[in-house]
Amino acid sequence: MTDFKRIPPEQAHAMRNAGAVIVDIRDPHSFANGHISGSRHLDNHSLPDFIAAADLDHPLIVTCYHGHSSQSAAAYLVNQGFSEVYSLDGGFELWRHTYPSDVEHDEQQ
């Protein structure tokens, strides 16, 4: 894959269930208030360690608020060597409406 692909929540859900990693690039407060179950928060501080430890060939799904910022982040991750990157269309907002029972909240806020 030389570029990322945009995918709907249904495809992201199936891919996540098959082992794809989901990274959430929203601000820490928004992530703490609700995020896709099993997703990992990714920001400028955690990015270098994430890239260093990641399997660059493992499917990676990027989510943001509405599916716009995730496209830039997905393109960046492709440029960093990730071979299978996806941007979640509709972002977390569409996910939480599509799969409300598949949302986690951090205990400490």
Swiss-Prot record:
Active site: C64
Pfam families in UniProt: Rhodanese (PF00581)
Entries under InterPro entries matching the protein: GlpE_sulfurtransferase, Rhodanese-like_dom, Rhodanese-like_dom_sf, Thiosulf_sulfurTrfase
Origin: domain of life: Bacteria
PANTHER family referenced in this protein's UniProt entry, alphabetically: FAD-DEPENDENT OXIDOREDUCTASE, THIOSULFATE SULFURTRANSFERASE GLPE
Task of the protein: Transferase that catalyzes the transfer of sulfur from thiosulfate to thiophilic acceptors such as cyanide or dithiols. May function in a CysM-independent thiosulfate assimilation pathway by catalyzing the conversion of thiosulfate to sulfite, which can then be used for L-cysteine biosynthesis.
Protein's recorded name: Thiosulfate sulfurtransferase GlpE
Gene: glpE
